[in-house]
Amino acid sequence: MTDYDPRIVALYDDDNPDGPDHAYVRRLADEVGARSIIDVGCGTGILTVTLASSGRRVVGVDPSAAMLAYARRRPEGDSVEWIHGDSRNIPPGRFDLAVMTSNVAQHIPDPQWQRTLVDIHRALRDGGVLVFESRNPAVRAWETWVSSEPTTRQTAHGALREWTEIELLGCGVVRLIAHNVFEDSGNHVVESETLVFRDREAIEEQLHEAGFTVDAVHGDWDGSAFTENSRLVIVRARRG
């Protein structure tokens, strides 16, 4: 993959702050008594470091070297094992909990997605829990992402002008193209990501094929039931 510009990485936590998704995961970790946790697609580690506590092993895996460099520099960064890679690089062991937040699941294309589920299933102990979310394709969130006009904000590197474009690549597949112009230097950074929107039925089928049992499907981080109009598909599944 083409890695992220470090100047954009430095803005990630402001754009994706700690919120109800992270609170949900922390509650779940306590609920299941997790002593070992794997955060797949951990990014800057904003959630990962909050899961680490005395006697608990926490591992963060991400394919972005720039994201991991930021994560390692966190004051609490030495409390986590950081691994550059994807699900194939999950270390041996029987984890109690695996998490994927910030719609990480949508960044993994087929068939790598099915392999990812199999890899996570293998890494969990019997009864170990997997939780992740994906945007509900029925809501068509991508239609709200196109910027009618560029916006500008101040950063540590000066004024940053931003706008977004999308391309529909097929059923449930969207390319998000983010333009970032650092006005002081004129440097134009373009970051492109392909997102896969999977519906509830497809997600459950893929989990079953990987050996998981689906315990719950929520439509929001407050634990409310999933409906066809829910913004998210939040899945809690277990090995065995």
Which stretches of residues belong to each language-model region?
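Conserved beta-strand signature within the Rossmann-like core of class I S-adenosyl-L-methionine
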Residues: 127-134
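A short glycine-rich, Lys/Arg-flanked "PGG" loop and its adjoining helix->strand segment in the class I
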Residues: 114-126
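Class I SAM-dependent methyltransferase "Motif I" SAM/SAH-binding loop
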Residues: 41-43
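SAM-dependent methyltransferase
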Residues: 134-204
